[in-house]
Amino acid sequence: MAIAAPARGEDIHQLARAVDEHYNHLRSLQSDFTEIYRGDGLERVESGTLWLKKPRKMRWEYRSPKEKLFISDGRIVWFYLPEERQLRKTEFRKLDDLRSPLAFLLGKTKLENELQGLSKVVDQAPVTAGNILLRGIPQAMAGPTNEVQLEITPADQIVRIVLLEADGATTEFRFTGWKENVELSDSSFQFTPPPGVETVEGELGP
């Protein structure tokens, strides 16, 4: 008598491996994003476009409600605020930022190593029916972030990331229109500040 294979999502290890395999073979990614912050009775919604390139290169272009730019070349991180004429700069290895987990999507990521106690979320529904929600404790951000939730599509794509912070706030990233292995120049992940811009070394701030 044949034994049916477990339904997708019942085997966490199998699902984690499928997500790993999907992203680890990619060279680059592009997506539109919406970032939603909720905390202290406030809600802040921002949106723009994200580009990722192996290894650890990121470019977040925020367009709404204000323009700002978050760039990593894998070694240095720049956060440019045009309205304030200010550039914040730090080393990637010192980065403790809510955007940083995405930098490790392209490479040799192992989801179960990044998120301790990885399990299926059963007390919440995904935003899109048919997707699966996973939760785990982030190894790299265990201090400021208590839990990370990932919404995974049947095609093993991550379309939503929710970070539950220690102070009770949540930051949610929603991704749409993923494009894989797009041609991206390394120059897209470099930044030269315009004349007259103040440069602040160290913490990137909010």
Q: Which residue ranges define each predicted feature?
A:
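Envelope-exposed proteins and targeting segments
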Residues: 27-29, 46-48, 54-56, 66-68, ...
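An acidic-aromatic
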Residues: 49-101, 171-172
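Bacterial N-terminal signal peptides
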Residues: 1-2
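Gly/Pro-enriched, hydrophobic low-complexity segments
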Residues: 113-196, 200-204
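Short hydrophobic/aromatic-rich beta-strand segments that constitute the beta-sheet cores
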Residues: 33, 58-62, 77-80, 136, ...
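N-terminal leader/targeting segments and the immediate start of mature chains
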Residues: 5-44, 193-206
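Flexible, surface-exposed loop/linker segments and immediately adjacent secondary-structure boundaries
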Residues: 85-131
